């Protein structure tokens, strides 16, 4: 069983997916973490982490590194780098690198391989998860929230250098990039359960989703 969660950046996908995983005893995967790890690989290869590298160069770098999945996390060369990928510098570049078709193909293949060779149930979150990666998943969710709310959430999560206004601009720019991507653009898929989380807490959102999920299972019996 796969529960797929889609939606824009900072809409609550990761927090909600993690909590649902605990409540439902499902394994949690974030495709966004994979793209962030790849962005970290790119940044480590450059003298100036604000520069960008070409798609071909990045594809070659990925081959030189080992990205694996273990205990609910993607590892880079055996190291859990989560504390190195959730920052403003990664935020600024990840949407650029995730627009490379070759990079998206690698990430999508990696995600499908993890699920294919496992008998576990999964909650997988990320942009285009419901439309491209797992469009056939049994339960599809699209989480949304206003830009102001999403910026405030990210501001509270981070101790970075960006102001609230700068975060709003960053999220608007990223939304624009994600919605205009040639491949894997951000959009609603057919049969998705849409939920605006702007003024809902984590518990409320999870309760709504679980109620909808259980109702769906009853109807399909």
From Swiss-Prot:
Biological process according to GO: pyrimidine nucleotide metabolic process
Gene3D superfamilies referenced in this protein's UniProt entry, alphabetically: P-loop containing nucleotide triphosphate hydrolases
A Pfam short name: Cytidylate_kin
Organism: Borreliella burgdorferi (strain ATCC 35210 / DSM 4680 / CIP 102532 / B31) (Borrelia burgdorferi)
Residues that, per the record, bind ATP: 7-15
Localization in the cell: Cytoplasm
Known EC number: 2.7.4.25
Entry's Gene Ontology cellular component terms: cytoplasm
UniProt KW Nucleotide-binding keyword: yes
Residues annotated as signal peptide: none
Gene giving rise to this polypeptide: cmk1
Record key words, sorted: ATP-binding, Cytoplasm, Kinase, Nucleotide-binding, Transferase
Organism ancestry: Bacteria, Pseudomonadati, Spirochaetota, Spirochaetia, Spirochaetales
Similarity section: Belongs to the cytidylate kinase family. Type 1 subfamily.
Major location (coarse): cytoplasm
Reaction it catalyzes: CMP + ATP = CDP + ADP; dCMP + ATP = dCDP + ADP
Stretches that traverse the bilayer: none
Annotated HAMAP family: Cytidyl_kinase_type1
Name by which UniProt lists this protein: Cytidylate kinase 1
Entry's Gene Ontology molecular function annotations: ATP binding; CMP kinase activity; dCMP kinase activity
Database matches in InterPro entries: Cytidylate_kin, Cytidylate_kinase_dom, P-loop_NTPase
């Amino acid at each position: 069983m796969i529960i797929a969660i889609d939606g824009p950046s900072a809409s609550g996908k990761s927090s909600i997916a993690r909590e649902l995983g605990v409540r439902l005893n499902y394994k949690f995967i974030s495709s966004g973490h994979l793209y962030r790890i790849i962005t970290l690989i790119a940044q480590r290869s450059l003298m100036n982490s604000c520069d960008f590298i070409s798609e071909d160069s990045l594809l070659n770098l990925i081959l030189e590194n080992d990205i694996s999945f273990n205990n609910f996390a993607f590892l880079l060369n055996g190291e859990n780098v989560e504390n190195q990928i959730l920052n403003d510098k990664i935020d600024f570049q990840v949407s650029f690198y995730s627009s490379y078709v070759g990079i998206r193909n690698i990430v999508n293949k990696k995600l499908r391989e993890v699920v294919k060779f496992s008998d576990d149930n999964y909650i997988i979150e990320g942009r285009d998860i419901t439309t491209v990666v797992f469009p056939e998943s049994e339960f599809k969710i699209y989480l949304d929230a206003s830009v102001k709310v999403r910026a405030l959430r990210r501001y509270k999560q981070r101790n970075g250098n960006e102001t609230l206004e700068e975060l709003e601009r960053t999220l608007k720019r990223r939304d624009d990039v994600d919605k205009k991507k040639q491949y894997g653009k951000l959009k609603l898929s057919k049969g998705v359960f849409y939920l605006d989380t702007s003024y809902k807490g984590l518990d409320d959102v999870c309760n709504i989703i679980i109620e909808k999920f259980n109702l769906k299972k009853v109807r399909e019996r």
